[in-house]
């Protein structure tokens, strides 16, 4: 039995899960609706307010899919009930961020500004306080999508190990390197 797959997913109040005959799992909650196609070999059922994921055999493929789909369904349930939030910190002199509609404008030390069109499912806000680093906050119900977008924003200016400048997740610890020592 998969250690992750055998754990049932508890459905909070106001969250509904339905499975179609074609194994399409739909999760509806107060924040929205998410769908996920599940492999035909994996069985998903709802028992006493808990989602149970089962596999037919002990094959390596089935074991892997068992844990995968249980985690995906768990992420969907958490997304539609609580949502996901990612905060990115822009560390560097002159780094700025503004969010209008679904366009994120970033100044990251390049000779040009960067305009990033965000998917409609993601809401973004930028907070700039005097004397502090700008913070970009992303909110979404889809964990995979918010992770992908935040990784793309982070890759626009990777963290530099000597001074620690760049885009980082809030609270991320950066390994710093010592610079060259001057010889006499």
From Swiss-Prot:
Record-annotated disulphide pairs: none
- InterPro entries per record: Ribosomal_uL6-like, Ribosomal_uL6-like_a/b-dom_sf, Ribosomal_uL6_a/b-dom, Ribosomal_uL6_bac-type
Where on the tree of life does the source sit, at the highest rank? Bacteria
**The UniProt record lists the keyword DNA damage:** no
GO function terms (MF aspect): rRNA binding; structural constituent of ribosome
Q: Name one GO cellular component term.
A: cytosolic large ribosomal subunit
Primary role: This protein binds to the 23S rRNA, and is important in its secondary structure. It is located near the subunit interface in the base of the L7/L12 stalk, and near the tRNA binding site of the peptidyltransferase center.
- Protein's name in the database: Large ribosomal subunit protein uL6
Q: Which organism is it from?
A: Cytophaga hutchinsonii (strain ATCC 33406 / DSM 1761 / CIP 103989 / NBRC 15051 / NCIMB 9469 / D465)
């Amino acid at each position: 039995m998969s250690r992750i797959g055998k754990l049932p997913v508890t459905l909070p109040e106001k969250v509904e899960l339905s499975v179609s005959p074609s194994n399409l799992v739909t999760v509806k909650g107060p924040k929205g609706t998410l769908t996920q196609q599940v492999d035909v070999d994996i069985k998903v059922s709802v028992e006493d307010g808990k989602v149970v994921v089962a596999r037919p055999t002990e094959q390596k493929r089935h074991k892997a899919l068992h844990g995968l789909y249980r985690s995906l369904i768990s992420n969907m349930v958490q997304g539609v009930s609580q949502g996901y939030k990612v905060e990115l910190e822009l560390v560097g002199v002159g780094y700025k961020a503004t969010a209008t509609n679904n366009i994120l404008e970033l100044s990251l030390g390049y000779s040009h500004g960067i305009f990033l069109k965000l998917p409609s499912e993601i809401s973004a806000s930028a907070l700039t306080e005097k004397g502090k680093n700008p913070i970009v906050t992303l909110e979404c119900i889809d964990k995979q999508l918010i992770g992908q977008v935040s990784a793309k924003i982070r890759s626009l200016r990777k963290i530099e190990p000597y001074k620690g400048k760049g885009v980082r997740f809030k609270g991320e610890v950066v390994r710093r390197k010592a610079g060259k020592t001057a010889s006499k």
